[in-house]
Amino acid sequence: MRFFLGLFIVFISADFSFGQSLQSSATPKTPPSKAAGCAPPTTTTYLELNNVRAMIHTAGNLWQVPNQNFSQYEIPKNSGIMALFTAALWLGGTDVNNQLKLAALRYRNGQDYWTGPLTKITAETTYENCSKYDRHFVTTQDMIREFNAWFEAGLADQQNGTNTQSQQFPDYKVPEIIKEWPAHGDVTQGQDYYLAPFYDFNGDGHYNWEDGDFPWYDIKKDKECNVDRSVSLYGDMNYWWVMNDKGNIHTETGADPIGMEIRAQAFAFASNDEINNMTFYNYELINRGTQTLYNTYFGFFTDGALGDPFDDYVGCDVSRGLGY
């Protein structure tokens, strides 16, 4: 290996921990269940806040250039050096009849994941729903801090008869992403009302940016991380999207779907230390399926190729839930 760099990718989970590989002796088969006929997701965005330039997809995998044997996890950025090839969630288990239910990807030779939330009771989706959510919702912490400062300055002006907002923010325009933040699912279709995390400024339970609500970075530091399991937005720059495994027939694994809704985040920090060479990923898993899974394994498939792909080593620190 001719090139070495302190490289670190952290996969954070809100509802599970990575560990054992997904294994089963059952042979996958093409499921007879109804599918929504969703098209494969196509959105690709680069996460390049710090010293890493990483290709992020809505389709369930990371880094690999679509339909090519090349990757885009470049570190240092603009060096032409690709340190990792691809990665994806592997989720699987058996139902009460010992039938395998599995959602997984390797190199996108097929598709097991689609975009959009599922209905809460029946774990269903539609072609239109999948298409609507085929995007990354990109925010930065600086953007949210500026919006909050602008809004609170306006409140102070109303209370005190001042004009601080116009003086300090003369040309400010509320970013479109704050206005169109996907805080709520479509309850008329049976989706969860609460979708993407948001800060509810007036506590009315409804997202409205004109009331001071914003995509929820914990900028007010009122989240007790040691006891609060609710998921906020992380990082200095954050890409949020939502996926499911019920949008169509599983052509990557050939297995029956689970009915899993996955709320994903890819994020990074800008810093002057090792974190500047890192990217982070968070997956919140919600089982919308009607059946309990047994013998269940959640894992994260990673094909790393640091320099020469034939002399790489992997390891883990079990006590810290860390793979490297």
Question: Predicted regions span which residues?
Answer:
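Bacterial Sec-dependent N-terminal signal peptides
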Residues: 1-23
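A long-range scaffold signal marking pre-active-site subdomains of enzyme folds
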Residues: 20-324
